[in-house]
Amino acid sequence: MSRKHSAPIRKVLADPVFNSVLVTKLINAIMLDGKKSLAQDILYSAFNLVKEKTQKDPMEVFQAAIDNVTPQLEVRTRRIGGTNYQVPTEVSARRKQTLALRWLVQYARLRNEKTMDVRLANEIIDASNKTGGAIKKREDTHKMAEANRAFAHFRW
């Protein structure tokens, strides 16, 4: 990996249906092998299922899910004096959003429902209700950070 230049941050266009950049980022997280239209179909279908099951606006449920899944702290490995320490650090705003979306999709894929749109809809609903795999991942991440609080002075 080259250390000279970091990749430029590209602007993401807002989703045409929900007019949200966050929805576009979720579509991009769902997308496999460049099949964006398939990812869009999955997400829109999942949002329709969310609307049917909760009788609420799917964007509100999705926003609540993202807010609940977003991590505040994480541990980063730092080598000091031949020993590796797990140092708790605050998560930057962009990484918070990225991790939340990644975890939602990751734990939706691990669910046992038949199709991805049902899995994603149920994971979004669970996350908005503070249950589910993505919430557990966030809690585990926070527990790790809390357990390694003694090494917080190694922050950089």
From Swiss-Prot:
Arranged from A to Z, the UniProt key words for this protein are: Ribonucleoprotein, Ribosomal protein, RNA-binding, rRNA-binding, tRNA-binding
Q: Biological process GO annotation list?
A: translation
CDD domains attached here?
uS7_Bacteria
User: Which organism is this entry from?
Assistant: Mycoplasmopsis agalactiae (strain NCTC 10123 / CIP 59.7 / PG2)
User: What does the protein in this record do?
Assistant: One of the primary rRNA binding proteins, it binds directly to 16S rRNA where it nucleates assembly of the head domain of the 30S subunit. Is located at the subunit interface close to the decoding center, probably blocks exit of the E-site tRNA.
What family classification does the UniProt entry report for this protein?
A: Belongs to the universal ribosomal protein uS7 family.
Pfam families, A to Z? Ribosomal_S7
Instruction: Name the SUPFAM superfamilies for this protein.
Output: Ribosomal protein S7
Ribosomal protein keyword on record: yes
> Can you state the subunit structure given in the record?
Part of the 30S ribosomal subunit. Contacts proteins S9 and S11.
- Give the molecular function GO annotations: rRNA binding; structural constituent of ribosome; tRNA binding
* UniProt GO cellular component terms: small ribosomal subunit
Protein name as catalogued: Small ribosomal subunit protein uS7
